[in-house]
Amino acid sequence: MKLRYKIASGLLMIVAVAITAFALVLSHTSACEPAAGIADIAEGAETMKAVVNRCYGSPDVLTLEDIEKPSPANDEVLVKVHAAAVNPYDWHGMRGSPYLMRLGTGLGAPKQIRFGADFAGTVEAVGKDVTKFKSGDRVFGGAAGAFAEYLTFRENRAALIPDDVSFEDAASLPIAAITALQALRDKGKIEPGQKVLINGASGGVGTFAVQIAKSMGAEVTGICSTRNVEMVRSLGADHVIDYTKDDYTKGDEKYDVIVDMVGNHSLSENRRVMSPEGRFVIIGGLKGDWLGPLMGPIKAMLMNPFIDQEMGLMIAHMDGDDLAELAKLMERGELSVVIDRRYSLSEVPDAIRYSEEGHARGKIIISLEP
């Protein structure tokens, strides 16, 4: 088994690196120029402030510009944004890293230059085919261009905000909380009483994963640094391991599900502390320009056919029904938000820099309210 795994792993690595190199070479053949239809504002059109990402690079490539205010298509909703949230998804897209992702996001420059994804705001107008929302509704969801005063989205990518939930708290949910929910429910297939370990319990996804796993009846162990131990415990974790003092992969406890946002231990190390038919769900991993966090999932995919345990990558998808479920958890008091820092729209580059450091406790918010 080990020999077949190593051969398959090597072949797939060669293919992945070749594709990545091809994408990188092509990326250097294209100039980074303003996209047509964005820089040019129609005469008499309304404008708005928006953060724009025209080129791959550091946060310095992000610019705050006046662009044309969007109008909703027949199946779209126009929302005035009051708050947005930062995710690793944003800065991976900003840098075009790992390079392999450029095959989808654009080789020479980003295809989608409106920046940001998580939003919360008030519906201003709806297309004629929209039935789920109406003008004045408070909504949250995920759509391209969240770091702006307005955006349009399709109604299946959002849900109503409960009356007692703030725009900032609602904006914190979409990518991070949906990733946690789908990882635990769909990939982890958690059952009441199972032992679940969350590696990276103090981050954006991790803080939600701890709470959602508890709401599903699991016995939860959270992994975090010393300064976050009490915070993770306050979210409901039954056990908290300080990774600066103890290595969970060297302990005697066996876990039914491990959700990993960090990628600081090998698959074999994690397998040692998994139950015989346990599940290992990869959400994040170590940085790197070539394959980055994709290296772990590639190895897991190759290993899966040869073992009883299940290992794989979690790729979340924005879903209005899941957002509504998260809203219900908040209404019932089973899900709360940890906000680390707040930034204004003009400070988005600073927010991205802080997110890239990898030490945020919970969520980073972009506030558009006066």
Q: Which residues fall in each region the model found?
A:
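Mid-domain Rossmann-like dinucleotide-binding core that forms the NAD(H)/NADP(H) cofactor-binding site
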Residues: 171-242
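Glycine-rich phosphate-binding loop and adjacent beta-alpha segment
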Residues: 265-335, 368-370
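C-terminal hydrophobic helical "lid"/dimerization subdomain
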Residues: 2-12, 43, 317-370
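Glycine-rich beta-strand-centered segment in the early N-terminal region that forms part
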Residues: 70-85, 99-145
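A short acidic, Gly/Pro-enriched loop at the edge of an enzyme's catalytic core
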Residues: 249-257
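NAD(P)H dinucleotide-binding glycine-rich loop of Rossmann-like/cofactor-binding domains
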Residues: 92, 105-118, 125, 138-200
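N-terminal membrane-anchoring alpha-helices
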Residues: 2-42
